């Protein structure tokens, strides 16, 4: 299932690499607020640095961010032009944090975050070749330097999985193998779909319950009923995904199955066509297809 990832356009542009500096220039920019709150940013006079400069204004105590992680963060980004330094974008203006896979992110952002811990505030002065390079967003020059303030809320490795209590289970002939911390194995029956919506929590997490409007981090596999192979799997792609639930960004069946489920849970669900892709998703899914999903709820923000 192709879910919409929030605000990733500000991170997901390839660029050439360089070595990070000691962060003196980045630290000279004042970013004032508590962690997780929109900062007030004051730039020094003069031009931005020519190389990548990274600093840490707050130090977290969570997991260390690794190169293949999906990162969830609040951020504010400016064009650092040495004059007006205009705001580029901020997750605080969108009502939810951003999510982005480091392996597909701006080179400067990826390098800046690796090695820092969840709960840290990272600041980065990013030169053009480590930012958008020759493909900047509309209204921004190709030679623009950037400045990011990033509050790291979470980091999720490719093997992240449900962590609650429970294990293998069945739903209307579907079999799901695998326990907490393990990748699930999904097997569908060779029978007609049961009709109607069904869902079942196989592993029940101990976290807060998912609320409509939150950004939810997941691992999942989706199958067309009767198919031997998945049409999409974050496990196979080695990349957890995040989406905003309750705003029409995912299929209706996901919203029905996941809102109210505790974080850390694994849910298996059967979606009739009207709760899945009722218009189809050619060439993978026809409008008449019933779908089966197994979803691990890793976090909600």
Model-assigned labels for residue ranges:
Residues 2-301:
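Cross-family detector of peptidyl-prolyl cis-trans isomerase
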């Amino acid at each position: 299932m192709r879910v919409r990832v929030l605000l990733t356009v500000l991170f997901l542009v390839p660029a050439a690499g360089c070595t990070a500096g000691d962060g003196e220039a980045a630290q000279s920019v004042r970013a004032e607020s508590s962690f997780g709150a929109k900062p007030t940013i004051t730039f020094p006079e003069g031009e931005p640095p020519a190389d990548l400069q990274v600093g840490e204004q707050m130090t977290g105590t969570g997991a260390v961010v690794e190169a293949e992680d999906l990162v969830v963060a609040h951020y504010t980004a400016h064009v650092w032009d040495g004059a007006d330094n205009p705001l580029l974008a901020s997750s605080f203006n969108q009502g939810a944090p951003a999510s982005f896979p480091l392996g597909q992110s701006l080179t400067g952002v990826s390098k800046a975050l690796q090695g820092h811990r969840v709960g840290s505030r990272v600041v980065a002065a990013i030169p053009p070749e480590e930012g958008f390079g020759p493909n900047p967003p509309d209204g921004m020059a190709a030679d623009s330097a950037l400045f990011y303030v990033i509050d790291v809320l979470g980091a999720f490795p490719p093997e992240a999985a449900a962590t609650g209590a429970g294990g293998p289970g069945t739903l209307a002939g579907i079999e799901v193998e695998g326990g907490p911390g393990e990748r699930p194995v999904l097997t569908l029956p060779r029978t007609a779909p049961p009709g109607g919506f069904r869902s079942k929590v196989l592993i029940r997490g101990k976290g807060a319950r998912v609320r409509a409007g939150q950004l939810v981090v997941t691992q999942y596999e989706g199958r067309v009923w009767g198919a031997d192979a998945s049409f999409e799997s974050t496990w196979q792609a080695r990349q957890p995904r995040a989406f905003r639930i309750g705003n029409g960004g995912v299929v209706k069946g996901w919203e029905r199955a996941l809102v109210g489920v505790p974080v850390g849970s694994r849910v298996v669900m059967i979606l009739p066509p009207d709760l899945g892709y009722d218009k189809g998703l050619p060439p993978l899914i026809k409008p008449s297809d019933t779908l089966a999903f197994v979803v691990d709820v890793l976090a909600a923000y």
